């Protein structure tokens, strides 16, 4: 049965509206037919009438019909057709982006759009169990990302470090003595209700996670018992009663990862308990082993996570951005096929990005910048909505094609262009450490064996060539594109990087030529070890870029590293990260000469795991930015040969 709702309302030209236009829509709709017209928004009398038509079916939408919509913008009206309010909400987000401003005038771009999500789960997780984040910050993220059609917020509420959900039945769970970090910082039951309602207003599903039976030292501190014990299970059921009574949500996530199961009845009993209360249950995989019908959804983590027929799966396997660098991993994330399929179905639900705060970071906004949260989320927003992708993370990995006519390169470059537009127009007050990288070109040498002598010099330090002869062997150079390049990925050969078979105890060199139309002061983002936000790694020694003895020269002058704010020698997750990562420190201030400039990087590596750094990342980040680090430097040309 069809019915019609005629709405006449007038869009205000305000900071909450995305002025993008068809050319900058993000995520890109499935199908756009532009009519080449713009319809002026001049006054309340002339703004278009918006007609919302609720229909029983949209035959043009092949999957996830509940979230699909048809949107048509013409001179006299804007027509939205959808099956549910969800589709109407997403249509409105697209409509906001179709509003274009020119001076003090506003226009709608005329078009017809057929749109729907390829995957029904498109989300992010905040690990507030380890590091508390305010309700205001969570709301800001949810509201902002819902404009880009992110529809799931995974709330990891409990951890060893703290139980962040208020318990009226067991207040000692929230006592300072039960915490290992940020004591007594938790969400009241009223705040949880408020956040659930806020998510619903923004078309976002909130999934609370009560991690069990592992990651539960806070529980054990409060009660002096193991969750898997008879007494522990009885207490846990009462705590779950509070969750069910106060959080009006369909799903409860129960964790079950990284734990030895001493009680084989624990997980089945907890799943049954929640199901009997009308909740669907999600569990990590790897974790407890389920058969179809025994769990409602699994969330895959680590390379060992496997989707199972008959159990809907969420992909988080390579989506832990606490290990991501700012540039190269974004390429892999954008190009990756979610769950290695182009489009979701009953067994393939979608993807959730995770931020794990094993390492303490002071300041909730610093968590976002250290993890390059918003660039990663926009990449996921596009891929999870649009579907497709060229391969999984373990396919082509983090490398951009060097042929700029390659469709994979063109697709990423187009996404980057649109994402950067949104950064400079809509994320101006948000932490967003990204500039375009598809124009940054390098030549990288074959790796020279250094036999463990990281300080050893090799021919590229004397002259830059396309190939070198050294000790009877020829070493070639190869083109690479990107502001961040992995020579060997964080996860080794699991994720392809520049070298196909990287070996320890080798030294590589990378160089580029940069044309500047004038002599100018600019900033330089440079780094040789991206510090994971879930590792205990030690800060670099003062006066050194890293423990690998990496170096950088600009126009034959060696550039010194910043002064490191941390100098501790103790491996501890409770000693905060400071300015180890380039995103949180001011750019290096350098001078570019008029016309051509030369940049040379020395990239040694010893072992791939050391006492100071568990996951040695053989990589570099290097790109010029404005002195304040907010934008790209205009009119620079990167080239792998001097012209």
Predicted features by range, described:
Residues 502-515, 584-586:
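Short beta-strands within extracellular/lumenal beta-sheet-rich domains
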Residues 537-539, 543-620:
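Beta-strand-rich ligand-recognition modules
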Residues 22-24, 64-233, 237-251, 269, ...:
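Feature activates predominantly on carbohydrate-active enzymes
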Residues 518-542:
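A short beta-strand element within beta-rich, extracytoplasmic domains
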Residues 219-297, 301-308:
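Active-site neighborhood of glycoside hydrolase catalytic domains
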Residues 8-113, 283-285, 294, 413-417, ...:
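Acidic, contiguous N-terminal accessory segments
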Residues 302-439:
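Flexible, acidic glycine-rich loops studded with aromatic residues
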Residues 21-41, 413-503, 533, 602-643:
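Accessory carbohydrate-binding/adhesion or oligomerization-edge regions at the termini
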